[in-house]
From Swiss-Prot:
Its EC number is 6.3.4.13. Gene3D superfamilies: 3.40.50.20, ATP-grasp fold, A domain, ATP-grasp fold, B domain, Phosphoribosylglycinamide synthetase, C-terminal domain. This is Phosphoribosylamine--glycine ligase. ATP binds at residues 138-193. It comes from Corynebacterium ammoniagenes (Brevibacterium ammoniagenes).
Length: 426
């Protein structure tokens, strides 16, 4: 099978690694990719305009792929999948209308309300609101204050704070950009990321994972795109996963069909598990980053066949997914000054830099035959083991041998679960 992957981050490196290991994959391409991906696929670095449907179609018509896998959310919201499907190309990823479940938080709230899915109460604050009206809404919702940019913000458009001034500042910042704000009630409880393959009303869950959004240890610092993740969750039972599928993912998939925007692709439910069970924090319309990296490292079922089943509408015929009986942890190595203004161009050295079992490249480039940093989240380090403790130890051992000036990483990815400090009633 000839396959084209769209994207250039650590998530796409993980997807390429999985596809390359599948005997059904005969020819693998990526755009725009990264020099680090060249050992797995043909890299089309000139095709950087991933959100331009015409440009992506041009590449697809040249390559003639049997399957296109779209990694990031921006091309999905921009309608790249629609354009490719219109030309008869099988695509893993939702059409633009369905991708609004991530592209507009207000739209996602409408879907959840219609589907009867538990979520935080919310109010949309449009640009142009008076200061008095904003203060009235802050009185009603906080503290804690949960302030979200209604559009795409790469996981960094959310402020959760007890500081009213900080909440007010973020509202004004989002409004100044011309975007609405979604003000929400705070959802307490441990967070769960559950990815589901969705083909119309057919829903197949992957292993549950937990992301770590804050930049620094102990969940301190600003929100980021994600500083690490682990899977599976020792504190969430199979019955708990079934409950999320039954109460959240299946009703949303059914509601999308009823709205005339059937979902095809990966539906990512970000949830908080409170006293009454799971409530939705957000939906994403694609594989999450960095949760995808540990998840796919445990998947035994060949990946190309899985993604193709979704893309061709045959997910209901796919045999049950098989997983390694193990734990996996991903820790993100971030550049200096991430997430505000990450520094680029610093040399990276490690004896494991080309070992995709240990390191995936999220934001690197090559200059004068030297690997350098080229993004905020630079490397994703993978550790696997029979226990969560062993997986954590494996990841941090690799990190100790990486040199990147002024870089940093969290030392507590998965630690609360390892120490038994997370528990729920499922």
């Amino acid at each position: 099978m000839r396959i084209l992957v769209i994207g250039s981050g650590g998530r796409e490196h993980a997807i390429l690694k999985g596809l390359a290991a599948d005997p059904a994959t005969t020819d693998l391409h990526v755009a725009p990719g990264s020099p680090a991906f060249a050992s797995l696929a043909t890299v089309h670095a000139d095709y950087k305009e991933v959100a331009d449907p015409a440009r992506m179609l041009e590449l697809a018509q040249d390559i003639k792929p049997e399957l296109v896998v779209i990694g990031p959310e921006i091309p999905l919201v921009a309608g790249v999948a629609d354009t490719l499907r219109a030309e008869g190309i099988a695509v893993f990823g939702p059409n633009a209308d369905a991708a609004q479940i991530e592209g507009s938080k207000a739209f996602a709230k409408e879907v959840m309300e219609a589907a009867g899915v538990a979520t935080a109460r919310a109010q949309t604050l449009p640009p142009g609101m008076t200061d008095d009206d904003i203060e009235h809404e802050l009185d009603y919702f906080g503290p804690m204050y949960v302030v979200k940019d209604d559009g795409l913000a790469a996981g960094k458009g959310v402020v959760v704070t007890a500081d009213r001034a900080e909440a007010r500042q973020h509202i004004h910042l989002v409004h100044a950009a011309g975007n609405p704000v979604l003000l929400e009630s705070f959802l307490d409880g441990p967070e769960v990321s559950l990815f589901c393959l969705v083909d119309g009303e057919t829903v197949v869950p992957l292993l549950p994972a937990q992301d770590h959004k804050r930049a620094y240890d102990n969940d301190e610092g600003p929100n980021t795109g994600g500083m690490g993740a682990y899977t599976p969750l020792p504190w969430l039972s199979a019955e708990g996963v079934d409950r999320i599928v039954r109460e959240v993912c299946e009703p949303v998939a059914k509601q999308m069909v009823e709205r005339g925007t059937p979902y095809s692709g990966l539906l990512y439910a970000g949830l908080a598990w409170g006293q009454e069970g799971p409530s939705v924090i957000e939906f994403n319309c694609r594989f999450g980053d960095p949760e995808t990296q540990p998840l796919l490292s445990l998947l035994k079922t060949p990946l190309a066949g899985v993604l193709n089943a979704v893309a061709t509408g045959t997910l209901d015929e796919l045999p049950a997914l098989e997983w390694e009986d193990a734990y996996a942890v991903t820790v993100v190595l971030a550049a200096a000054n991430y997430p505000e203004s990450p520094r680029k161009g610093d040399a990276i050295t490690s004896p494991d830099l080309a070992d995709t079992d240990k390191i995936l490249h999220a934001g690197t480039a090559v200059k004068d035959a030297e690997v350098i940093s080229n993004g905020g989240r630079v490397l994703n380090v993978i550790g696997k083991g029979e226990t969560l403790s062993a997986a954590r130890a494996a990841a941090y051992e690799v990190l100790e041998n990486i040199e990147l000036a002024d870089s940093f990483y969290r030392t507590d990815i998965g630690q609360a679960a390892e120490e038994g400090r997370i528990s729920i009633d499922s």
